[in-house]
Amino acid sequence: MVTTGREKLKPFRYPVIVKPNAEGTSKGITSASVVKDETAARAAAKQLVDRYHQPALIEEYITGREFTVGLLGERRPKVLPPMEVVFVDPPTHPVYGYEEKQTDTPRVRFECPAQLTPSELRRIEKVVRDTFAALACRDVARVDLRMTKDGRVYVIEINPLPGLTPDFSDLCVIAKVAGMDYRSLI
């Protein structure tokens, strides 16, 4: 967590992604959020701190496929089908940022359900359930993940209050694919 841009940083394996600590919908995240050295990380963090008046997070950038997964319920939540965010003609380090989430951009498309092997699906379901439980989520959440080429799954964000705009918000789209109408989801 960076509050000034002058803090001593832990050693990172670059590239890293720099993002606001407490924004939603990837506000403050663009392709420029992925940086390749400490100087650029400090500059990006300072810019976010100044713009959003909150700490910035610096995390190792995870290369791989990106998914979002909805969960519904309590102790053993129902895991909805994973939706893959597929980057069209991606740059070296693609990000699913604010602009991509707010517009009908040709830079991303969605596959729901995602094309996964049974073992990949089980791994993702375990990670999202464990994350839901570890954070004591209730009723609903959406977990964003990256899966590396060797099948390791990393949580990049959890949203315990996901958007619910019909036919637009990820959770609503995923629920519809799972055969759930909007009224049942709500």
Give each language-model segment a name:
Residues 1-57, 63-65, 76:
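Active-site nucleotide/adenylate-binding loops and adjacent lid/helix of ATP-dependent enzymes
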Residues 13-15, 66-68, 142, 155:
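Broad gene-expression machinery/nucleic-acid interaction feature
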Residues 20, 73, 84, 159-162:
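Short beta-strand elements
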Residues 21-23, 101-103, 161-164:
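Short connector loops/turns at beta-strand edges and beta->alpha or beta->beta junctions
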Residues 25-28, 107-110, 166-169:
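Short small-residue beta-strand/loop micro-motif enriched in glycine and branched aliphatics
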Residues 38-126, 147-154:
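Phosphate-binding site of ATP-dependent enzymes
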Residues 115-186:
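ATP-dependent carboxylate activation and anion-phosphoryl transfer catalytic cores
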